UniProtKB/Swiss-Prot annotation:
One GO biological process term: translation
One Gene Ontology term of the molecular function aspect: structural constituent of ribosome
Keyword rRNA-binding attributed: yes
NCBIfam families the record matches: S6
InterPro entries noted in UniProt: Ribosomal_bS6, Ribosomal_bS6_CS, Ribosomal_bS6_sf, Ribosomal_S6_plastid/chlpt, Transl_elong_EF1B/ribsomal_bS6
Protein's name according to its UniProt entry: Small ribosomal subunit protein bS6
Family: Belongs to the bacterial ribosomal protein bS6 family.
One Pfam entry name: Ribosomal_S6
GO cellular component terms given for this protein: cytosolic small ribosomal subunit
UniProt source species: Helicobacter pylori (strain J99 / ATCC 700824)
Function text: Binds together with bS18 to 16S ribosomal RNA.
Length: 142
């Protein structure tokens, strides 16, 4: 299975129940095709960068998932035929570096510290600890 991110924007004229049903529909499309949704972000109603189909706002939803490549065509087809979807994008993460970035995005969405950030914080702590030791040694030698 490959790593993917999808984002879609729904029309702002939909009521809350319709928005929830659209989101659930696309989540089910992923899971019915043996995909695994790692995490998702319900970003809510936001201003669009530019007008799309006479709408200045849209409802944003992002999902990070693992799935077989064959399923992506079906997901994109379903986005295209739904008139309530203003825009969509599906991003595939292929290389090792991209997959690591995908994991970092998933961790951030789940509010977990990323692995790279933890390593950086440990290194930073060690450097600041050594700097404090050096200062205390200097003050004792005077």
């Amino acid at each position: 299975m490959r790593h993917y991110e999808t984002m879609f924007i729904l029309k702002p004229t939909l009521v809350e129940e319709e928005i929830k049903s659209k989101i659930e529909f696309y989540r089910e499309v992923i899971t019915k095709h043996h995909g695994v949704i790692e995490t998702s972000l319900d970003m809510g109603m936001r201003n669009l960068a530019y007008e799309i189909k006479k709408h200045k706002r849209g409802y944003y939803y992002v999902a990070y998932f693992k799935a077989d490549p064959s399923m992506i065509l079906e997901l994109e087809r379903l986005y295209r035929i739904n008139e309530d979807v203003l825009r969509f994008i599906v991003i595939k993460y292929e290389s090792k570096k991209e997959v690591e970035a995908w994991h970092a995005l998933v961790d951030r969405a789940n509010k977990k510290p990323s692995h790279a950030k933890e390593k950086h914080e440990k290194t930073e702590h060690t450097h600041s600890h050594h700097a404090e030791e050096a200062k205390s040694t200097e003050s004792h030698s005077e």
